UniProtKB/Swiss-Prot annotation:
It comes from Xenopus tropicalis (Western clawed frog). GO terms for molecular function: RNA binding; translation repressor activity; zinc ion binding. Zn(2+) 1 binds at C61, C64, H77, C88. This is Nanos homolog 1. Keywords: Cytoplasm, Metal-binding, Repressor, RNA-binding, Translation regulation, Zinc, Zinc-finger.
């Protein structure tokens, strides 16, 4: 195999280290980064899951339920809209430290598309 085509985890060909470093630096104007788990402004009202969805175990937002939020919170909204946009106000306020995604396309580090590129080849796979 040609050595030039192999991925070298010690070289930063994609420039990800600078992307991450920029995300860790204070913002211009002395503004400090916003808290990562602050709830964002509410999204337009979305219908709650139907009775059929609830019968199949879909009882509100799985993200909030997994994080042991109150039932009144996690049952008040869904995690995602049918088109894939994030509806959860808690997750919408989170900014992924790897890629900077938030709002409609927010996700945690576990679901970040860049995590596969940043993982050390000999590290365990997320407890799996």
């Amino acid at each position: 195999m040609d050595g030039g085509l192999c991925f070298n985890s010690w070289s930063d060909y994609l420039g990800l280290s600078s992307l991450i470093s920029r995300g860790l630096q204070p913002r211009e104007g002395g503004e400090s980064p916003r808290p990562r788990w602050k709830a964002s402004s509410p999204t337009p009202a979305e219908p709650l899951p139907s009775k059929a969805a609830e019968a199949h175990g879909h009882k509100g937002c799985g993200f909030c339920r997994s994080n042991r939020e109150a039932q009144s919170l996690y049952s008040s909204h869904r995690l995602r809209a049918p088109d894939g946009r994030v509806l959860c106000p808690v997750l919408r306020g989170y900014t992924c430290p790897l890629c900077g995604a938030n709002g409609d396309w927010a996700h945690t580090m576990r679901y970040c598309p860049l995590r596969h590129f940043l993982r050390h080849p000999h590290s365990p796979r997320d407890g799996q």
